């Protein structure tokens, strides 16, 4: 399981802001997220526990980057006590965590944008999405491709990909997924409506946008950023003018 943190600090990393703890299973591309306030080690550990509890399959190994939120006694001790292998990315080798980095972009940044979130209300909305509609929509209805072969010929790189599947399909096709897990996933899938999930995601993103704008609109004199006009697209998040 690759793990990373996505900072919602906007244009400045001063003060306390929300961080999305993002986790991806390499074999199936299944993704889960959890928003925490700040980068505290104990909060990060609690987020990992919550994420692990929502995963449809068991964990064997966690592989974070080199941030102090993950490389610390609390996380290491938890991994040791729960019999998890603990590895980490090599310094300055961002591709070591390429799968979760892709999900950071697709499932977090492209959804909620690059602006600053730093309130409990915003945290509640993000986690409402991560715990419910967003995780269901991304894992059951958005396909991902696996790289099958990569060849270099005369200075050109040729890549061949496997047939695109959703994380749900990858898990259902995996012989290592238990029958109990497959039955639970199938039952959940049969009760989902992607159009309804999408509408609910858009409604919650709209509410998140309204809270963000109201936050800066009430503090114009103290914050120059609030004078900037933001446009909001519910499907992709905020975009600066």
Which residues does each PLM region occupy?
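Charged, gly/pro-enriched flexible loop segments at helix/strand junctions
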Residues: 132-168
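Active-site beta-loop-alpha junctions of metal-dependent nucleic acid enzymes
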Residues: 24, 33-56
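Short, conserved catalytic/metal-binding motifs centered on acidic residues
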Residues: 4, 29, 62-65, 138, ...
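Residue-level recognition of single "structural anchor" positions
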Residues: 1-12, 55, 74-82, 91
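Short, solvent-exposed helix-loop connector elements
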Residues: 111-127, 145-150
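Protein C-terminal end segments and domain termini
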Residues: 130, 163, 167-168, 180-184, ...
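An active-site-proximal beta-strand-loop segment
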Residues: 1-31
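RNase H-like two-metal-ion nuclease catalytic core shared by retroviral integrases
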Residues: 64-66, 70-79, 86-112, 125-127, ...
């Amino acid at each position: 399981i690759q793990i990373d943190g996505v900072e919602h600090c906007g244009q400045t990393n001063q003060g306390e802001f929300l961080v999305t703890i993002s986790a991806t299973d390499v074999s199936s591309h299944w993704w889960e997220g959890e928003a925490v306030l700040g980068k505290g080690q104990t909060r990060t550990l609690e987020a990992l526990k919550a994420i692990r509890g929502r995963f449809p399959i068991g964990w064997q190994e966690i592989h974070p980057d080199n941030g102090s939120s993950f490389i610390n006694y609390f996380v290491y001790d938890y991994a040791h006590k729960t019999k998890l292998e603990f590895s980490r990315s090599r310094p300055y080798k961002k591709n070591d965590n390429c799968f979760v980095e892709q999900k950071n972009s697709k499932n977090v940044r492209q959804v909620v944008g690059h602006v600053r979130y730093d309130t409990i209300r915003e945290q509640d909305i993000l986690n409402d999405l991560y715990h419910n509609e967003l995780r269901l929509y991304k894992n059951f209805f958005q396909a991902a491709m696996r790289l099958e072969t990569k060849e270099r010929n005369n200075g050109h790189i040729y890549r061949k990909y496997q047939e695109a599947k959703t994380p749900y399909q990858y898990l259902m096709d995996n012989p290592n997924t238990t029958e109990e897990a497959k039955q639970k996933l199938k039952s959940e899938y049969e009760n989902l409506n992607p159009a309804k999930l999408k509408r609910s995601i858009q409604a919650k993103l709209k509410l998140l946008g309204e809270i963000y704008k109201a936050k800066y609109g009430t503090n114009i004199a103290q914050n120059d950023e609030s004078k900037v006009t933001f446009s909001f697209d519910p499907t992709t998040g905020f975009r600066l003018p």
